[in-house]
């Protein structure tokens, strides 16, 4: 019996998932929320060493549309985040996740928005860049933006913003312990890229559902650019 047609988005997502598990982006771990659903991913983000996010374990979800990669996925933090470019809902305000339409009112260039040549790897790199370098122009969280600017302008003397971040980082340790996750705390640990273990029999069957034999082959914020801001620790 002929196999049913598989949407091209499933094939694209499977290739990306395997690639990210075999060669992870530093500071990230991606898995499926449900093994039978390629359109919903769980993302674990580890806070980069030598920043105020160091030691943090932040959980997020990536939800892909059926026409991916022609439309962007949605990225939402499950962990409570205090950041100028993250809404209270956890949704990230970043240009790369916006559909490729020409909207002069947005303050974004079309080239800053999503296009089909981009992928999950570029999204993850954009997210970690945004965490460390917030864009405070028309922010998603105004209060966080005001606090961040005070911290920046005081050269780190006003610590209200960073104190909130450190408190949130400490709070993520409970999630890490519950999930059995060892959070990297040194640059050496953070930069180690480990390949995913070989798939078991069940996983082979899962992959076979999407591919015929031999078929598998080898950040701007949402409101436009501004001067670089840094989330790294200052003396």
UniProtKB/Swiss-Prot annotation:
BP GO terms, sorted: proteasome-mediated ubiquitin-dependent protein catabolic process; protein K48-linked ubiquitination; protein monoubiquitination
Pathway listed: Protein modification; protein ubiquitination
Molecular function as annotated in GO: ATP binding; ubiquitin conjugating enzyme activity; ubiquitin-protein transferase activity
Main localisation: cytoplasm
Region spans: Important for ubiquitin transfer: 98-113
Disulfide bond annotation, renumbered to this chain: none
Listed PROSITE patterns: UBC_1, UBC_2
Keywords: ATP-binding, Cell cycle, Cytoplasm, Nucleotide-binding, Nucleus, Phosphoprotein, Transferase, Ubl conjugation pathway
UniProt PTM: Phosphorylated by CK2. Phosphorylation of the C-terminal tail by CK2 controls the nuclear localization.
Catalytic residues (UniProt): 93 (glycyl thioester intermediate)
Pfam families: UQ_con
Reaction catalyzed: S-ubiquitinyl-[E1 ubiquitin-activating enzyme]-L-cysteine + [E2 ubiquitin-conjugating enzyme]-L-cysteine = [E1 ubiquitin-activating enzyme]-L-cysteine + S-ubiquitinyl-[E2 ubiquitin-conjugating enzyme]-L-cysteine; S-ubiquitinyl-[E1 ubiquitin-activating enzyme]-L-cysteine + [acceptor protein]-L-lysine = [E1 ubiquitin-activating enzyme]-L-cysteine + N(6)-monoubiquitinyl-[acceptor protein]-L-lysine
Record PTM Phosphothreonine, positions in chain: 232
EC number: 2.3.2.23, 2.3.2.24
Compartments, record wording: Cytoplasm; Nucleus
Residues with Phosphoserine modification: 203, 221, 230, 235
Region SCF-binding, residue ranges: 190-235
One Gene Ontology cellular component annotation held by this UniProt entry: nucleus
Mechanisms controlling activity: CDC34-catalyzed polyubiquitin chain assembly activity is stimulated by the conjugation of NEDD8 to the CUL1 SCF E3 ligase complex subunit.
Domain UBC core, residue spans: 8-174
Record function comment: E2 ubiquitin-conjugating enzyme that accepts ubiquitin from an E1 ubiquitin-activating protein, and catalyzes its covalent attachment to other proteins by an E3 ubiquitin-protein ligase complex. In vitro catalyzes 'Lys-48'-linked polyubiquitination. Cooperates with the E2 UBCH5C and the SCF(FBXW11) E3 ligase complex for the polyubiquitination of NFKBIA leading to its subsequent proteasomal degradation. Performs ubiquitin chain elongation building ubiquitin chains from the UBE2D3-primed NFKBIA-linked ubiquitin.
Similarity remark: Belongs to the ubiquitin-conjugating enzyme family.
Record's comment describing the protein's domains: The C-terminal acidic tail is required for nuclear localization and is involved in the binding to SCF E3 ligase complexes, and more specifically with the CUL1 subunit.
Quaternary structure and partners: Interacts with multiple Cul1-RING E3 ubiquitin-protein ligase complexes, also known as SCF (SKP1-CUL1-F-box protein) complexes. Identified in a SCF (SKP1-CUL1-F-box protein) E3 ubiquitin ligase complex together with HINT1 and RBX1. When cullin is neddylated, the interaction between the E2 and the SCF complex is strengthened. Interacts with multiple Cul2-RING (CRL2) E3 ubiquitin-protein ligase complexes, also known as ECS (Elongin BC-CUL2/5-SOCS-box protein) complexes. When phosphorylated, interacts with beta-TrCP (BTRC). Interacts with casein kinase subunit CSNK2B.
Name of the protein in its database record: Ubiquitin-conjugating enzyme E2 R1
């Amino acid at each position: 019996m002929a196999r049913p047609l598989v949407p091209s988005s499933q094939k694209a997502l499977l290739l990306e998932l395997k690639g990210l598990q075999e060669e992870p982006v530093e500071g990230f771990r991606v898995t499926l929320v449900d093994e039978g659903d390629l359109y919903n991913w769980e993302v674990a983000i580890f806070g980069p060493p030598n920043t105020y996010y160091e030691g943090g374990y932040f959980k997020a979800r990536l939800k892909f549309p059926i026409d991916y990669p022609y439309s962007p996925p949605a990225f939402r933090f499950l962990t409570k985040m205090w950041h100028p470019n993250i809404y209270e809902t956890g949704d990230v305000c970043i240009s790369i996740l916006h559909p490729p339409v020409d909207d002069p009112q947005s303050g974004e260039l079309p080239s800053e928005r999503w296009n089909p040549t981009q992928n999950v790897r570029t999204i993850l790199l954009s997210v970690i860049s945004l965490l460390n370098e917030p864009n405070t122009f028309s922010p998603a969280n105004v209060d966080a933006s005001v606090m961040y600017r005070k911290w920046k302008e005081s050269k780190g003397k006003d610590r209200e913003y960073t104190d909130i971040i450190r408190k949130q980082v400490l709070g993520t340790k409970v999630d890490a312990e519950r999930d059995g996750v060892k959070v990297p705390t040194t640059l050496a640990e953070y930069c180690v890229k480990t390949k995913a273990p070989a798939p078991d029999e069940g996983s082979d069957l899962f992959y076979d559902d999407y591919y015929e034999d031999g078929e598998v082959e080898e950040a701007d914020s949402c409101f436009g650019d501004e001067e670089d801001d840094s989330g790294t620790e200052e003396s």
